[in-house]
């Protein structure tokens, strides 16, 4: 387990934390946390709180609404998991916490973190359960009947079990929207608003995400009350430890360029992002034909196949994962050292989520962007948006990677 003292630091000046009640607390022991929760935190492998944890946990425990922003790989999931667990009363086997995630994989990962950090708080190992699409609704109904204190799920399935009357909302204390920018995008906004219709009016709402565009902050005014804001300056929104490069290449030469990279560079594990399911399958097929151990994943695959692919990649049995933006948000694979954007993302926010797959928890990582002539303007937009510089890949790149 990667420990928090290995998480990529965010500079104190990176935070716009001029609101009252937002001050860094450098030790978990100095936070208002139950002893059994502290046991779980240290048992999980955390030693010192990351920057976002230093700022977000204490305001979370006070019960007010929160908008918190932190880069991928900086302990964001730990921050809201700890804050959420502190707010719950484990003497009552009632559903009190709800976490909404944009993907099944992220929901499953989040539930595991909450379960492990909270293992000394509950007599039941099943106090936290997942509710996601691609599984039998009947199984979810049985989970709820047996008793759940924390529910983690995707909006569609959570909305379904609420409407069935199986997930009772009157005892809910806390709602967390993870990857809030995605959750409030056009695809999820209607489902989120539908869920809010069933929630207690005094429920605590916490939004956590790596990016928080102004339009999302405007949307939050509809359902949040005087939230504490813990935001990062835009110029700080490129991960420390991630070196970014581009290769100028025409579309028809991208595959050959990719093959050349894998022939000349020693890569521990890498993620390749493409923008369509068809291209993902094609890249994976070509790499496998060239004797590379490659896995591929996209949203149209069955849930069981996606879980199998992720387990294979996490274990190191597969060293290359080709995927769409499905895994760009929050999927934890600690040994990825190179991210390749075979296609530049269509949306600037997803660039940050993608390159966050490399160099997680303070490790050195590299992002390589394949840029066609028509992509040049988008590349400049990404540089301007994050106040960063993306250099052309040096000729001696293999030597650089071996440093």
From Swiss-Prot:
Coiled coil location: none
Domain (Helicase C-terminal): residue spans on this chain: 241-401
Entry-linked CDD domains: DEADc_EIF4A, SF2_C_DEAD
Residue numbers covered by motif Q motif: 26-54
Residues that bind ATP: 70-77
Name of a matching Pfam family: Helicase_C
GO biological process: cytoplasmic translational initiation; translation
Domain of life: Eukaryota
GO cellular component, one term: cytoplasmic stress granule
Residue span of motif DEAD box: 178-181
GO terms, molecular function: ATP binding; ATP hydrolysis activity; ATP-dependent activity, acting on RNA; RNA binding; RNA helicase activity; translation initiation factor activity
SMART domains named in the record: DEXDc, HELICc
Catalysed reactions, as listed in the record: ATP + H2O = ADP + phosphate + H(+)
Assembly and oligomerization: eIF4F is a multi-subunit complex, the composition of which varies with external and internal environmental conditions. It is composed of at least EIF4A, EIF4E and EIF4G.
Family stated for the protein in its record: Belongs to the DEAD box helicase family. eIF4A subfamily.
Function text: ATP-dependent RNA helicase which is a subunit of the eIF4F complex involved in cap recognition and is required for mRNA binding to ribosome. In the current model of translation initiation, eIF4A unwinds RNA secondary structures in the 5'-UTR of mRNAs which is necessary to allow efficient binding of the small ribosomal subunit, and subsequent scanning for the initiator codon.
Name of the molecule in the record: Probable eukaryotic initiation factor 4A
């Amino acid at each position: 387990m990667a420990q928090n003292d290995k998480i990529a630091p965010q500079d104190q000046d990176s935070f716009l934390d001029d609101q009252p009640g937002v001050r860094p607390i450098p030790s978990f022991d100095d936070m208002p946390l139950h002893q059994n929760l502290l046991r779980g935190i240290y048992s999980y492998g955390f030693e010192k709180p990351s920057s976002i944890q230093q700022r977000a946990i204490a305001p979370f425990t006070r019960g007010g609404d929160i908008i918190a922003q932190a880069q991928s790989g900086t302990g964001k999931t730990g921050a809201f998991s700890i804050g959420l667990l502190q707010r719950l009363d484990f003497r009552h086997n009632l559903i009190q916490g709800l976490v909404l995630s944009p993907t099944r994989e992220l929901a499953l990962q989040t539930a595991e973190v909450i379960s492990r950090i909270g293992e000394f708080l509950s007599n039941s190992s099943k106090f936290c359960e997942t509710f996601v699409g691609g599984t039998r609704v009947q199984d979810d109904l049985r989970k709820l009947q047996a008793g759940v204190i924390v529910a983690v799920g995707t909006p569609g399935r959570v909305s379904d079990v609420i409407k069935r009357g199986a997930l009772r909302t009157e005892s809910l204390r806390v709602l967390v929207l993870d990857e809030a920018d995605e959750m409030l995008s056009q695809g999820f906004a209607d489902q989120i608003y539908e869920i809010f219709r069933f929630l207690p009016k005094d429920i605590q709402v916490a939004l956590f995400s790596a990016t928080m565009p102004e339009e999302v902050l405007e949307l939050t005014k509809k359902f949040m009350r005087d939230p504490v804001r813990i935001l990062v300056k835009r110029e700080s929104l490129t991960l420390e430890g991630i070196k970014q490069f581009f290769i100028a290449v025409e579309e028809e030469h991208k595959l050959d360029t990719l093959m050349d990279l894998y022939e000349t560079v020693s890569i521990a594990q890498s993620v390749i992002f493409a923008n369509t399911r068809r291209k993902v399958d094609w890249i994976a097929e070509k790499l496998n034909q060239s004797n590379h151990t490659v896995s591929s994943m996209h949203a149209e695959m069955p849930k069981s196949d996606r879980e199998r692919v992720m387990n294979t990649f996490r274990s190191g049995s597969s060293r290359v994962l080709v995927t769409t933006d499905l895994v760009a948000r929050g999927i934890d694979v600690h040994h990825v050292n190179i991210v390749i954007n075979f296609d530049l993302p269509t949306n600037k926010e997803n660039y940050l989520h993608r390159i966050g797959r490399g160099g997680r928890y303070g490790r050195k990582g590299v992002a390589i962007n394949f840029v066609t002539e028509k992509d040049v303007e988008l590349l400049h937009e990404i540089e301007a948006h994050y106040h960063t510089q993306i250099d052309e890949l040096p000729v001696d790149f293999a030597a650089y990677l071996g440093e």
